């Protein structure tokens, strides 16, 4: 899946939830049935607008971030080309 608008919806959702990247990473473990979650660095790639920013991510990672933020996945990511 691809992040929307270079990650702005993700950054907004993190801010609205009052979370840090570290706390969001912890929350992804809470919502992961396997208990693994995703790393702080992976979330950093999702939200970065600089050289470390990435546009494409595994579906599982996107799902965990959306669930941890209590947002529909479609608000944060899409399955098509980057927007």
Write out the residue ranges for each language-model feature.
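A short, Lys/Arg-rich alpha-helix, primarily the initiator
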Residues: 1-27, 31, 63, 74
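Recognition helix of helix-turn-helix/homeodomain-like DNA-binding domains
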Residues: 30-55
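DNA major-groove recognition helix of helix-turn-helix
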Residues: 47-51, 61, 77-80
């Amino acid at each position: 899946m691809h992040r929307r608008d270079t990650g702005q919806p993700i950054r907004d959702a993190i801010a609205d939830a009052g979370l840090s990247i570290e706390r969001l990473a912890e929350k992804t473990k809470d919502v992961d049935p396997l208990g693994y979650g995703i790393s702080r660095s992976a979330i950093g790639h999702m939200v970065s607008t600089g050289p470390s920013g990435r546009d494409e991510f595994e579906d599982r990672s996107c799902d965990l971030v959306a669930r941890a933020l209590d947002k529909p996945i479609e608000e944060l990511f899409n399955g098509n080309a980057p927007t």
